[in-house]
A protein has these predicted regions:
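Juxtamembrane/disordered regions of integral membrane proteins
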Residues: 1-126
């Protein structure tokens, strides 16, 4: 029973983080649309995907910490690792420059999960 409760918490946090992720991707496409036939190679076109990955992981991990306040680091890292696995798989499916892939994988997932745990313990947790 405890396992199912924790699994449902992880799924809820992943779902919320994914919604935030997609909102940032959509905003990036609305604010910085690429002209027709233009290759998205300018750095500005990679800003919002990076922000989407970072804030999606951050928000999902904060929600996970709120749902499971006794083991915040462990469960925040679970969310960060799952999002990292998605980021690694996206690297093989979506063409992007090496600088973006490396910055995304190194800065957007595990550090954001740890930052979420820090924010939760310092600012949100009563």
């Amino acid at each position: 029973m405890k396992f199912l409760l924790n699994l449902s918490r992880v799924i809820a946090a992943l779902f919320a983080g994914s919604i935030i992720n997609m909102c940032f991707v959509w905003l990036g496409q609305q604010w910085f649309p690429a002209p027709a036939g233009f290759k998205n190679a300018l750095p500005i076109h990679f800003l919002f995907p990076f922000l989407a990955h970072a804030f999606g992981t951050l928000s999902g991990a904060i929600l996970m910490c709120w749902l499971k306040p006794k083991e915040t680091r462990r469960y925040a890292l679970i969310i960060g690792i799952i999002f990292l696995m998605g980021g690694i798989s996206a690297c093989f499916m979506i063409p992007a420059p090496a600088w973006f892939i490396s910055a995304d994988l190194v800065l957007a997932y595990i550090p954001m999960a740890l930052l979420a745990e820090y924010f939760f313990n310092k600012l949100i947790k009563p």
